[in-house]
A protein has these predicted regions:
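Glycine-rich, proline-tolerant flexible connector loops at the mouths of alpha/beta enzymes
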Residues: 38-61
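N-terminal small/glycine-rich loop or linker at the start of catalytic domains
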Residues: 1-10, 73-84, 120-126
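Active-site-proximal loop/turn and secondary-structure-junction residues that shape catalytic pockets
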Residues: 10-12, 39-41, 78-81, 117-121, ...
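Well-ordered, non-membrane alpha-helical segments in soluble/globular domains
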Residues: 55-58, 138-141, 274
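Active-site acidic/histidine proton-transfer and metal-coordination neighborhood
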Residues: 18-24, 64-67, 82-187, 197
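Histidine-acidic metal/acid-base catalytic patches
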Residues: 1-33, 66, 95, 99, ...
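A short acidic, helix-capping loop that chelates divalent metal ions and anchors anionic groups
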Residues: 43-48, 81-86, 121-128, 197-198, ...
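Hydrophobic residues in well-ordered beta-strands that form the structural core
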Residues: 36-37, 74, 114-115, 158, ...
Length: 288
């Protein structure tokens, strides 16, 4: 069976943080091989710590995961909502944080670093006349970031987005960008729920389109054209069809959830719901 993973991001209803130092032990107990370590919020720990204290924090996380038999399979790099990439100084600040997170990724001994495209004209540039500028700003930014990633031996995983009027959002657009970058350290994070936001896209078909370029995944479901990060089977995705597509392309990575049991549940209910989440994921990939 394909290995399972799950995010540590509390903003997508992940309540594993309640377990404190035993978080990774709980992940292992529930059947997870790996985790998606969240470094998206640059206004919180470890970004707010000194370099020395940040390294100590990251090393503790790494060792707790290792002791529990859990692999930090991927790291989610900086992301802010609403996007603020409009000015050169905004993008310079992003670059500084992105490079810091790459260093953090290296301390965690993680080789997969997930990031979003820059949105210098906001989330709706299609039809504005700014599409090519959006692409060129991203090319310039990502080339510099890629050079830093290669220094650490880390692969940048460029994520498809749920913005229907943004020019670097669909799997097709992400694939074109990655192919233009033309580097084995620049690959794709397939976000299943983001594909589901587009009414006219079929996840299985898009998975086959991306094929060998898929390095990591964000797995969740959506409905009503919204990015809700719901559990599989709670939205519009055909999960058996998606599983077949993964088998067809020979994907051998981690089936990593970007959803989870509601964090507000009392402990006893959360335990049961969290196990159910893992069971749902395991059922989807049981033949892979």
């Amino acid at each position: 069976m394909m290995r399972l993973g799950i995010t540590t991001d509390s903003r997508v209803q992940n309540g594993y943080g309640r377990y404190g130092a035993d978080t990774y032990k709980k992940l292992a107990e529930h059947g997870y091989f790996g985790t998606d370590f969240n470094l998206s919020n640059t206004e919180t720990v470890p970004y707010t710590l000194s370099r020395e204290d940040a390294e100590a924090f990251l090393l503790r996380e790494r060792e707790m995961a290792r002791a529990a038999g859990v692999t930090i399979w991927q790291v989610h790099g900086p992301w802010r909502w609403a996007p603020r990439d409009f000015l050169p100084e905004d993008r310079a600040e992003r670059m500084e944080k992105m490079k810091w997170a790459l260093w953090a990724c290296s301390v965690l001994e993680c080789k997969n670093y997930v990031i979003h495209p820059l949105m210098p004209y906001g989330i709706e540039d299609i039809g504005s006349g700014n599409e090519e500028s959006t692409w060129e700003i991203n090319r310039t930014f990502m080339r510099e970031l890629l050079a830093e990633a290669k220094r650490y031996g880390i692969t940048i995983c460029f994520e498809n987005m749920p913005m229907r009027k943004f020019s670097i959002a669909t799997p097709e657009a992400i694939l074109r960008f990655v192919q233009e970058m033309d580097d084995e350290n620049f690959r794709i994070c397939l976000d299943t729920g983001h594909v589901a936001v587009f009414w006219d896209l079929d996840l299985a078909e898009e998975t086959r389109r991306l094929g060998k370029y898929i390095r990591v995944m964000h797995v969740h479901d959506n409905r009503n054209g919204l990015d809700l990060h719901q559990l599989p089977f709670d939205g519009v995705i055909d999960w058996p069809s998606f599983a077949k597509a993964l088998k067809d392309i020979g994907f051998d990575g981690v089936f990593s959830l970007e959803c989870g049991a509601p964090g507000k549940l009392p402990d006893a209910l959360f335990e049961r719901a969290a196990r159910l989440c893992a069971d749902i994921a395991a059922d989807i990939v049981r033949d892979l």
